[in-house]
Amino acid sequence: MEQTATTKQLLEQYYSGFARKEGWETVLSDDFLFTGGDMTRPEPLVGKAAYRQVIDRFSRVFDAMRVKEMIVDGENACVIGTYDFTFPNGARITGDVAEIWKARDGKLQALTIFFDTLTFQKNTPA
């Protein structure tokens, strides 16, 4: 039961910082694994720095986010996050993202996300 609370606490801290666009990376492991956003690349990005680069780009188009649902089972969790986006072309969209998490040794270790990549491709310049 202790690990479930710890995983939930890590996620709550992550999402609190993520919504403010600051401080979220403190709960990530240095060898963090991120998979998502590009269906042609199934292998994960490795490292906190690599994930931070992805989020720096993503942060330009999301205005707000909130956790819609969180299910935690030991070191594993699934979060449905609702994001409000404003794209460079002016399009405004609210959408849900499925986020599958793995925690290890008191840090968030891995994240795999699922979302509507076509909407992003249509609304962001190449």
Predicted feature residues:
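Short, cysteine-centered beta-strand-loop-beta hairpins and adjacent loop/turn segments enriched
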Residues: R60-V61, F85-I93
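Hydrophobic/aromatic beta-strand elements that line small-molecule binding cavities or substrate pockets
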Residues: Y51, M65-I71, T82-F85, D96-K102
